[in-house]
Amino acid sequence: MNQFYKRHFLRLLDFTPAEIIALLDLATELKKDKKSGCEQQKLVGKNIALIFEKDSTRTRCSFEVAAYDQGARVTYLGPGGSQIGHKESIKDTARVLGRMYDGIQYRGYGQRVVETLAEFAGVPVWNGLTNEFHPTQLLADLLTMREHLPNKSLNKMTLAYLGDTRNNMGNSLLEAAALVGMDLRLVAPKACWPEEAFVISCQALAQKTGGKITLTEDIAEGVNGADFLYTDVWVSMGEPKEVWQERITLLKPYQVNMRVLTLTGNPQVKFLHCLPAFHDDQTTIGKQMAEQYDLPGGMEVTEEVFESAHSIVFDQAENRLHTIKAVMVATMSKI
């Protein structure tokens, strides 16, 4: 019997270390089958609702292509396409959609929303992103890390994350590191560290799995010996402009540039980013940021690093498809 059948995928700590590895193994298998043209459809006849209270490129495309590859059909409910939480409660929306669909993806705001959907839908619910967690991204990250260091197990790898570690990526990295026994360094000013109680709980789990979680303001200490450097955008478009100035000033020293890569002491170090990235001035926002905050070479990462051989961000982006497909197949297929 499939251990994942009809389960939700809301956050990584809902799973055991062995289950996370099993999902990664399934993703590897599905990716291989797709590349070789011998993929077997296990979701034929399934209907999937994709709720997006926040717009997305990678998450939407990954869920849609994964569903189509497996023979399922999707309905996209965008920011203006549903009444969830406005004219209809989350609880009622869950019970309606659960009668019509075999699985529901939610990408939006509070974790409580996706948890309520899961509580009342009666079908598998998957977290495409909330303010608190981004578990599908971390599955893609772990798969990418395994692919680029095939002779090293996850519990022997070291990852340093630079920037604002209080966000959903910081939280999910903490959970992932604790589960797989990784050496995780969160490198950031103290004002940008995650909630202390949550860090302590993840460190306690990491002790059991052989992992190590370190928080430091010292860049050289944090990145020394790292196999992977990771960062994310420093500001979100929905945040007020005054927040931008304060945070960018705070995080400028933590930009991932060639100097930081050199500090790792690892000439083979790889760079990760969940995208989109402000690495140049070729977008409207990127140009505005570069001019307003004196960041001509990029914001959280420089163009030089982003376009270098160290960067594996597009392998990482592709793996969103394969890991999301693994979650869908695992939770909606009996075998």
UniProtKB/Swiss-Prot annotation:
List the GO biological process terms: arginine biosynthetic process via ornithine; citrulline biosynthetic process; L-arginine biosynthetic process
Q: Which domain of life is it from?
A: Bacteria
Where in the cell does this protein reside? Cytoplasm
Q: In which pathway does it act?
A: Amino-acid biosynthesis; L-arginine biosynthesis; L-arginine from L-ornithine and carbamoyl phosphate: step 1/3
What keywords sit in the KW lines?
Amino-acid biosynthesis, Arginine biosynthesis, Cytoplasm, Transferase
Report which reactions are catalysed by this protein: carbamoyl phosphate + L-ornithine = L-citrulline + phosphate + H(+)
Is Amino-acid biosynthesis one of the keywords UniProt gives this record? yes
In which broad location class does this protein mainly occur, judging by the first location in its UniProt entry? cytoplasm
Enzyme Commission number(s) from the entry: 2.1.3.3
Q: Which GO terms describe its molecular function?
A: amino acid binding; ornithine carbamoyltransferase activity
Q: Which GO terms describe its cellular component?
A: cytoplasm
Give residues annotated as binding L-ornithine. N168, D232, S236, M237
Q: Which Pfam families match?
A: OTCace (PF00185), OTCace_N (PF02729)
Quote the record's binding site residues for carbamoyl phosphate.
S56, T57, R58, T59, Q83, R107, H134, P135, T136, Q137, C274, L275, R320
Q: Which family does it belong to?
A: Belongs to the aspartate/ornithine carbamoyltransferase superfamily. OTCase family.
Function, in words:
Reversibly catalyzes the transfer of the carbamoyl group from carbamoyl phosphate (CP) to the N(epsilon) atom of ornithine (ORN) to produce L-citrulline.
Q: What is this protein called?
A: Ornithine carbamoyltransferase
Q: The organism's lineage?
A: Bacteria, Pseudomonadati, Pseudomonadota, Gammaproteobacteria, Enterobacterales
